[in-house]
Amino acid sequence: MKIKMFFLTTAFITQSTYASELPVIPLRDLVNAALTHQPSVAVSYYETEKKNSDLDLSRAALYPTLDLTSGLNNNRKESSGTERNVENKVSLSYRITDFGVRGANIRKSEYERDNSKTDYEKTKNIVSQEVVTTYYNISKYREMIDGVNLEKEFYKKMLETFSLLVSSGVAMQSDMRKVQVSIDALNTRSIMYQSMLDDEMYKMQNMTGLNLSPVQIQSDEKFNLFKKYIFVESPEKLMDMVMKYNDDYKILVNTRKAATEDINAAKSSYFPTVDLVSSYVQNNPSGSAKKSDYEDEFKTGINVSFNIFNGFRNSAQERKMVASYSQAKLQIDDFLIKTRYNIDSQLSRYAAAKETYSVAERSHTNALQLTELYEQEFQLGQKSLLDLISSRNEAFQAYVSMIDSKYSLYILKLQQLSLIFHLMDYLKGNTESELNVMK
C-alpha cells in the first residue's frame, strides 16, 4: 500500500511539474496556427489565384495572336499523277477595336480579383474571431473553475472543523450535512464547467491542429489588449468605419462596379469589331506538282464584323446585366439596413453589459465583505451555519455574474473589432493606436 501511494504521489508530482513546464502560447500564435491549419483559408487563397488567372485571360485579349500551321495535301490527277504539297502557314490576327468590350471585361476581372482578395482577408478574420472567442471561453471557464476550487477549499476546511466538533459533541450531525451538501453542489458546478472547458479545448485543438493543455492558454490577467480597445459608442462614426473598412461592404461595392462593366460590355456588343489579319503561306510541292501552281503568298487585310440580327441576344444580355446591377445595388442597401440595426443592437447590448459588469463587480465586493462579517459573527455565535452558507452562496453567485458580464464585454468588443478591422492586424500589437486615432 505504501509503495502504491509512493508511485501515485510521484506521478502526481511529475504531472504537476510537466504542466508547469508547458509553454504558454500567446493568442497571436494560436491564431497563426489556425490560419495555417484551417482548409477554408487555403481554399480562399486559391480562389484569389483563380481570379488572378481570370484577369490575365482578360488582358490576353489585348495582344495579337500568332499561329503556325502545317499540312500535307495529296491531290491525285489522272493526267499528271499525284501532286503533293506541304503547306506552312503563319497567321497574325490583332483586334484593333471592339468599342470597349475588352476594356470592360478587364475592369470586371479586376473587381472580381479584388473581391477574391477581400474575401481571403474576410476568411482569415472569421477564423481569427473563432479562435479569439474560443480563447475567451477557455479563459472564462478557467476562472469559473478557480472560483469553485476556492469555495471547495473553504468548505473542506469547515468540514474538517465540524467533524472534530461533532465527534466532541459540540456540533450536530446536521451541520456537517449542510457543509457536505454545499461541497456536492460545488462539485456539480465544477463538473459542468470542466465539461464546458473541455469542449472549448477540443474546439481550439481542432482549429489550430495543436495538442494543447488549458495551462498553455494565456490567462486573462496577462492579456489585456482587448481591455485597452476603446469601444466606439457613436453609431454614425461606427457606420462610417464600416463603409470604409468592412470586408462585406467592400465586396458588395466591387460587385456593383463589376455589374456596371457588364452593362458597358453588353452595350458595346452592338458595335462592330475591327480586326487586322495577316498571313504568310509557304508551299513545298513534290511529286508531279508544279512549282508555279503552288506559289508562296502573303496576305494582309482588315476585317470588319457587324452583327445584323442574332435573335435579340444582345438586348437580352443587356437586360440581364441591368438586372444584375440593380440587384447589386439593392444588396448594398440591404447590408446597410441590417448593419445599422446590428450596430444599434450592439451598442445597446454593450451599454447593458457595461452596467451589468459594474453592478456585478460592486455586488461581488459587497458580498465578500458581508461574508467576512458573517464569518466573524458565526464564530461569536451570532449567526447560524445556514446564514454563513447562504452568504457564501451569494458571494459565489456574484462572482459568477461578474465573470460572465466581464467576458460579455470582451465578446462585444471582439464583435465590433471584427466588424471594422482585421483581427490579425490588431493582434500584431502595432495597430492599436491607429484604431483609436480613426475613432
Task: Identify the meaning behind each predicted range.
Residues V43-S58, T123, V127-V148, K157, ...:
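Amphipathic alpha-helical coiled-coil segments
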Residues E21, R28, S401-K439:
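Acidic, low-complexity, intrinsically disordered peripheral segments
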Residues K4-I13:
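Sec-dependent N-terminal signal peptides
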Residues Q15-E21:
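Sec/Tat signal peptide C-region and signal peptidase I cleavage site
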Residues A42, T65-N85, S93-K122, K250, ...:
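Small/polar (Gly/Ser/Thr/Ala-rich) solvent-exposed segments
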Residues M5, I25, I126-M241, Q346-R349, ...:
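Periplasmic alpha-helical coiled-coil/stalk elements that build and connect Gram-negative outer-membrane
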Residues R28-Q38, M176, L210-S279, Y426-K439:
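Amphipathic alpha-helical coiled-coil scaffold segments and their short linker/junction regions
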Residues N85-E87, T133, K178, E297-K299:
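Transmembrane beta-barrel architecture of outer-membrane proteins
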